[in-house]
């Protein structure tokens, strides 16, 4: 064997060792690159989860509102949310100041079928409840007759206050838990004027989308209604994801079940005592009282308002008068007489009010693809 061949044989181990070293270096480099990619992806994912919506811009504004037509009210709302959620916008609003207030009847929930839901609850208590109808007072019975007149389209002066007083008395001495169950039992029955719907399911689905949309953009949602506060709590339980403390409504007194007529200043609440309805009306949460309760209970001026009647006018004007963050006020028009128990004359008056007061109208007839869901239909009117 010549020296040249011997030289090649002698170099083989060294070449193999060098090849192995290069292979291991390449593997290590690949592993480092892969690890770096995973680390970067992990950091990005974690940052995305921890970054508040208020710092992410308007990505969330594309969520929901699928039950709305491509209407002016929808455009106004979406454009507004896009402006106030962009950190670099001059109109940016911090999360803690993003507050929206909603009326209930006719704004989130069916207003008349044929009358307000709390009117129907009172009628049932006085005229049908086997445990109470024989105890009903003459004033309560007279109020029921006024409600029947109202159902037929008559104007009954002062009915809202008389009903609130009579209603409070009709449920006196009932515990809060008992009242909650009573209301829910009543709401579990079929809706009088509709097919395939229970009384408690008569929420406007497009408006529930608005609430979801606003909550996705870090809004605090409040209900501010003329309906009794504890009735609303029972109604929205499991339907709208807001704390009980975010519900503002008509007030009646609450006492301890051993308190009797002892003054609040003199009575000491007992351990393990329960709370009951005293049966005494305090205030109807309508008109200027809505502004009063908003500033008392929320402590800030909201930036969005949703209502449907003159009872919501003060609330609407309060919101659009916000000097720190100019707000928007929306008003629903009850102009759908096919899918809903609408009132065209009333809707036209509200539309005029919207034009005069810079409120944004929402047409139930033209702006919504559905009201209660396509499976729900209005019964034929006799």
Per-range role (PLM):
Residues 13-21, 41-64, 82, 177-382:
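C-terminal cap/substrate-recognition subdomain and adjoining C-terminal extension
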Residues 63, 85-88, 92-94, 160, ...:
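Residue-level detector of functional hotspots within protein domains
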């Amino acid at each position: 064997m010549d020296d040249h061949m011997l030289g090649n044989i002698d170099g083989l181990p060294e070449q193999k060792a060098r090849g192995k070293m290069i292979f291991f270096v390449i593997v290590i480099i690949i592993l480092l690159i892969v690890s770096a990619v995973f680390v970067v992806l992990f950091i990005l994912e974690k940052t995305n989860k921890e970054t508040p919506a208020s710092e992410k811009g308007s990505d969330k504004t594309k969520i929901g509102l699928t039950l709305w037509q491509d209407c002016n009210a929808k455009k106004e709302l979406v454009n507004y949310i896009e402006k106030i959620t962009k950190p670099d916008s001059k109109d940016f609003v911090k999360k803690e100041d993003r507050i929206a207030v909603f009326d209930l009847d006719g704004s989130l929930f069916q207003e008349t079928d044929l009358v307000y839901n709390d009117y129907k609850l009172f009628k049932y208590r006085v005229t049908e409840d086997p445990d109470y109808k024989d105890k009903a007072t003459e004033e309560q019975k007279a109020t029921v007759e006024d409600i029947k007149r109202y159902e037929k389209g008559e104007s009954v002066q002062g009915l809202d206050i008389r009903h609130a007083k009579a209603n409070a008395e009709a449920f006196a001495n009932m515990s809060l838990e008992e009242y909650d169950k009573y209301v829910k039992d009543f709401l579990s029955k079929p809706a009088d004027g509709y097919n395939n719907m229970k009384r408690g399911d008569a929420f406007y689905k497009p408006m529930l989308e608005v609430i979801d949309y606003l909550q996705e953009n870090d809004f605090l949602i409040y209900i501010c209604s003329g309906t009794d506060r504890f009735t609303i709590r029972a109604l929205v339980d499991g339907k709208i994801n807001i704390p009980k403390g975010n519900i503002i409504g008509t007030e009646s007194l609450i006492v301890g079940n051993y308190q009797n007529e002892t003054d609040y200043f003199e009575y000491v609440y007992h351990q393990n005592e329960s709370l009951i309805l005293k049966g005494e009306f305090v205030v109807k949460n309508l008109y200027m009282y809505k502004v009063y309760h908003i500033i008392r209970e929320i402590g800030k001026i909201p930036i969005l308002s949703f209502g449907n009647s003159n009872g919501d006018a003060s609330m609407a004007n309060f919101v659009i008068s916000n000097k720190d963050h100019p707000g928007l006020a929306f008003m629903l028009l009850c102009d759908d007489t096919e899918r809903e128990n609408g009132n065209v004359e009333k809707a036209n008056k509200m539309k005029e009010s919207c034009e005069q007061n810079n409120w944004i109208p929402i047409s139930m007839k033209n702006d919504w693809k559905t009201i209660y869901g396509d499976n729900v239909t209005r019964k034929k009117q006799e």
